[in-house]
Amino acid sequence: MSQDRRYTGCNTHSNTHSAQDREKEGAVPKISGGKILPIYITGHAVLHAPAKPVTDFSGIQEIVRDMFATMFAAPGVGLAGPQIGLGLRIFVYSYTEGDTLHQGVAINPDLLIPKGVPKRQTNKQQANNSTSCDEPDREGCLSFPGYQFPLERAPQVTLSAFDENKKPFTVHATGWLARIFQHEFDHLQGTLYVDRLAQKYSGEVRQAVLNNKWGIPGKYWVPQEPKE
């Protein structure tokens, strides 16, 4: 998920995330080194197919380092395995909320999302969900770079996963962190956030794909090394 956080008039969701939940969020990975990898763009097959569970943790430390290095260089707040061509159920995230850093890796995650959030929004549903704002918060995606679209998400979710040490954890997230978890979890299901947009944005999405010659395998971009 791209780092560009944009609001349209207001943000109605609370970003409360308790210290107790933070302790359950899994061990914060020790991040040093790591290679910056190509980020694949919509059209690459791995982005549009469900990822497979991680069964071998022996090389996971290096994968995690590379994913963090790539995410920070992008820059982004989340990155899933399929985005770097790895069809495994793993994502990393790093999001600062006030003075609190939410950072970790989720391996073989499950995400509990309250009922009532549509798989794809209709224009009417979006209008009904936006009575206190002009439109829902916008999202961006490193696999659909340079664009942001409004998308309604569940205001709270529960993530259960394993960290890089194969230790299980559960975290209850609200607000923007909940949005990040939903966005990255979607990647593991073979879904991009643009697949969920209201129909009225489908023309813009198609035009973006045409203009950039996306929608075919092998398209990618490589983030630049961050300057010291």
Swiss-Prot record:
Keyword Hydrolase carried by entry: yes
EC nos: 3.5.1.88
Keyword tags: Hydrolase, Iron, Metal-binding, Protein biosynthesis
One matching Pfam family: Pep_deformylase
Cofactor entry: Fe(2+)
Reactions mediated catalytically: N-terminal N-formyl-L-methionyl-[peptide] + H2O = N-terminal L-methionyl-[peptide] + formate
Catalytic residue positions: E184
InterPro entries: Peptide_deformylase (IPR023635), Peptide_deformylase_sf (IPR036821)
Keyword Metal-binding assigned: yes
Recorded superkingdom: Bacteria
Record's cofactor remark: Binds 1 Fe(2+) ion.
NCBIfam families, sorted: pept_deformyl, PRK00150.1-3
Protein name in the entry: Peptide deformylase
Organism: Tropheryma whipplei (strain Twist) (Whipple's bacillus)
Gene label: def
